[in-house]
């Protein structure tokens, strides 16, 4: 008896989506002359001045299927008949072009299946047509379907003479597998007890519903029964659950208000499913039982549903300039790979930090001068009424470049400062994120705090040099000060003057900023979880408002400690001393000086920095087997034709227009409808899966 293996479509790689360019088509139609050129390249028959393709020309040479020498002739003819509407064994150019157009229609998957069954090419399916194709499938060879039963008679009539049109055929094809499953149950229960054994249950599901099974479900079909016999209601509920998994996912999203990470109980999903008459409590019981068999947990989240029935999706992402896969799987993450990942993040963070600092540096200069302005006046010192007045006077007295006084040392320090902050935050978040990708709020706050503490090593020397350069222009007759002269004057220990105040500012800032950014970013993602660059910019700016404003008192104290006090100005010995003296001499409002400037500087700076950092990770993508920024790609449920378009292979440049989706669509006929055709001819032993998959 011949051994069959599945029709070889599972090897097709997933490549970028072929977007719709002609409404309502998903694929742009090929030009007639270009299509004719491709047709003539493969057409091997010439009759009466016309060229034709044979079945082998079309299926084996053009589509690249059944490349083995011992291919199944009947399967090749069946597939060629889809395009051969005249059913004369030859494909003309007009038929070749017509099928290309069919592949561009929104319901191409069903129409392709219909033409597979329309053996006479008259636009209808007869009983003989249906029976002929069904009898050639692998499923029928393993679990025969009764072609004389009541199901067939309901569709084709008692005498089996009724013809089925396209619209009716789509329903027939949908109902066929459900009926086949019930008939298989009856065949395994000849005594009519209403029960079958666990092994028979496994055999039926693997054969009749294998196009709906994931490896995790397939491996647990026996264990989910707990060794008990399977009743007919349980069997029907199980098959219904597989069919309704997309509906189950919608129920879950309704129960969690759109969150894909919330863990929910059986009672919660039962409550949410009350409005869905298609879902029964028994199906929910099986769902949780199956999820427990797969990963041994009492509650489920969206990833558990995807493990049972993965979504067909396309990835919507920014164009990648480079893509590197450092490891094959997360299990291969060595210490060296993790160091490389941190180095990669540090490099991108440095560039992002420099970009962000340059954009907002004029605002930072205004903020610093406002914070350093003491109560009362000082001879020769420019007085500012507000931030806008400060901005105008800097431009008037020092020129436009005066707004960038001290930028160079700022860039030299801000690059590693922002890099270490972003890297440490990502590193700690990675360590505190569970296997499902969830991280508690306390862990987000801790990661941000660690990031803030780590940056002080770079921030304090940078800040003290920057501040002294920024305030140097306030004295009209003052000599020009260089960054290096400030460094030599302060020395190593002097560069860390005010470090306590710096910690007092940076730790709470980052502890507030990063969790706020992550949650705001998630809220601004679209329904598919994707963040447009503008939403990243907005999330970064919004998160900067509370973070920057709430730590302004610490920033004022740090500025006063690090600036050089002029003659007649109060000097401070430490954080507590500065706090007491500022309060006594200037009142509590002095602690909030420059708040507006700080918010207007920090919010856009971090917005620009974060959007640059995440976009760089999208553009220069490296998979280290760890976590990627959320929102960088969307897992969007697609239609069968979109799935086909997303799986287009570019190996054959002759697959143009609708033919770009030909092979994936034929795979869809197999995977969606379970119409697996034998690949090898009779008497040929099947090879292993790895060797059986051809090009």
From Swiss-Prot:
Compartment(s): Mitochondrion inner membrane
Binding site residues for Ca(2+) 2: 118, 122, 124, 129
Catalytic activity: L-aspartate(in) + L-glutamate(out) + H(+)(out) = L-aspartate(out) + L-glutamate(in) + H(+)(in); 3-sulfino-L-alanine(out) + L-glutamate(in) + H(+)(in) = 3-sulfino-L-alanine(in) + L-glutamate(out) + H(+)(out); L-2-aminoadipate(in) + L-glutamate(out) + H(+)(out) = L-2-aminoadipate(out) + L-glutamate(in) + H(+)(in)
Binding residues annotated for Ca(2+) 3, in chain numbering: 189, 193, 200
GO BP field: aspartate transmembrane transport; gamma-aminobutyric acid transport; gluconeogenesis; L-aspartate transmembrane transport; L-glutamate transmembrane transport; malate-aspartate shuttle; wound healing
One GO CC term on file: mitochondrion
Gene3D superfamilies to which the protein is assigned, alphabetical: EF-hand (1.10.238.10), Mitochondrial carrier domain (1.50.40.10)
Residues reported in the UniProt entry to bind Ca(2+) 1: 84, 86, 88, 90, 95
Pfam families named among the record's database cross-references: EF-hand_5, EF-hand_8, Mito_carr
Protein family: Belongs to the mitochondrial carrier (TC 2.A.29) family.
Name this protein carries in UniProt: Electrogenic aspartate/glutamate antiporter Aralar, mitochondrial
Organism expressing this protein natively: Drosophila melanogaster (Fruit fly)
Phylogenetic placement of the source organism: Eukaryota, Metazoa, Ecdysozoa, Arthropoda, Hexapoda
């Amino acid at each position: 008896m011949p051994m069959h293996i599945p029709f070889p479509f599972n090897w097709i790689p997933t490549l970028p989506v072929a977007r719709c360019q002609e409404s309502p088509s998903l694929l742009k139609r090929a030009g007639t002359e270009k299509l004719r050129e491709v047709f003539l390249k493969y057409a091997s028959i010439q009759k009466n001045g016309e060229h034709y393709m044979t079945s082998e020309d079309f299926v084996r040479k053009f589509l690249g299927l059944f490349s083995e020498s011992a291919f199944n002739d009947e399967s090749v003819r069946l597939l060629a008949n889809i395009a051969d509407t005249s059913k004369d064994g030859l494909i003309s150019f007009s038929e070749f072009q017509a099928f290309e157009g069919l592949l561009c229609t929104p319901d191409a998957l069903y129409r392709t299946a219909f033409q597979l069954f329309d053996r006479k090419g008259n636009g209808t399916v007869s009983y003989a047509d249906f029976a002929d194709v069904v009898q050639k499938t692998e499923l029928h060879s393993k679990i025969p379907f009764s072609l004389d039963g009541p199901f067939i008679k309901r569709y084709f009539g008692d005498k089996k003479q009724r013809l089925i049109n396209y619209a009716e055929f789509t329903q027939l094809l949908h109902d066929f597998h459900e009926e086949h499953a019930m008939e298989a149950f009856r065949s395994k229960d000849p005594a009519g007890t209403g029960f079958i054994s666990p092994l028979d249950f496994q055999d039926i599901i693997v054969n009749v519903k294998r196009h709906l099974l994931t490896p995790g479900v397939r491996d647990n079909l026996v264990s989910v029964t707990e060794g008990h016999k399977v009743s007919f209601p349980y069997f029907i509920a199980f098959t219904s659950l597989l069919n309704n998994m997309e509906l189950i996912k919608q129920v879950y999203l309704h129960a969690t208000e759109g969150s894909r990470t919330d863990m929910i109980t059986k009672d919660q999903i039962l409550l949410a499913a009350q409005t869905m008459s298609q879902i029964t409590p028994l199906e929910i019981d099986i769902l949780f039982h199956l999820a427990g068999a797969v990963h041994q947990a009492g509650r489920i989240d969206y990833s558990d549903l995807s493990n049972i029935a993965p979504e067909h999706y396309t990835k919507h992402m920014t164009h990648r300039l480079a893509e590197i896969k450092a490891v094959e799987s997360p299990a291969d993450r060595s210490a060296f790979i993790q160091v490389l990942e941190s180095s990669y993040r540090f490099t991108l963070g440095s560039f992002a930090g420099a970009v962000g600092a340059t954009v907002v540096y004029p605002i930072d200069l205004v903020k610093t001068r406002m914070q350093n302005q003491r109560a009362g006046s000082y001879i020769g010192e420019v007085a500012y009424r507000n931030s806008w007045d400060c901005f105008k006077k800097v431009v008037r007295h020092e020129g436009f470049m005066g707004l960038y006084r001290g930028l160079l040392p700022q860039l030299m320090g801000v690059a590693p400062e922002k890099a270490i902050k972003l890297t440490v935050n990502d590193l700690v978040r990675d360590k505190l994120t569970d296997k499902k990708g969830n991280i508690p709020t306390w862990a987000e706050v801790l990661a941000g705090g660690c990031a803030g503490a780590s940056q002080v090593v770079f921030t304090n020397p940078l800040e003290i040099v920057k501040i002294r350069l920024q305030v140097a222009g306030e004295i009209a007759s003052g000599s020009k000060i260089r960054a290096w002269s400030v460094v030599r004057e302060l020395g190593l220990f002097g560069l860390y003057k005010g470090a306590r105040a710096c910690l007092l500012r940076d730790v709470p800032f980052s502890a507030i900023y990063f969790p706020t950014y992550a949650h705001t970013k998630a809220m601004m993602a679209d329904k598919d979880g994707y963040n447009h660059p503008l939403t990243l910019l907005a999330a970064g700016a919004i998160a900067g408002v509370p973070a920057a404003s709430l730590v302004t008192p610490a920033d004022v104290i740090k500025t006063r400690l690090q600036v050089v006090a002029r003659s007649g100005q109060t000097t401070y010995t430490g954080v507590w001393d500065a706090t007491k003296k500022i309060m006594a001499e200037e009142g509590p409002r002095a602690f909030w000086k420059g708040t507006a400037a700080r918010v207007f500087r920090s919010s856009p700076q971090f917005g620009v920095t974060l959007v640059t950092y995440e976009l760089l990770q999208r553009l220069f993508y490296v998979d280290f087997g760890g976590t990627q920024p959320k929102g960088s790609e969307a897992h969007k449920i697609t239609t069968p034709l979109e799935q086909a378009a997303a799986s287009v292979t570019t190996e054959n440049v002759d697959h143009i227009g609708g033919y770009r989706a030909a092979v994936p669509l034929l795979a869809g006929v197999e995977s969606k409808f379970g119409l697996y055709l034998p690949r090898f001819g009779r008497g040929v032993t099947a090879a292993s899966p790895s060797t059986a998959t051809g090009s």
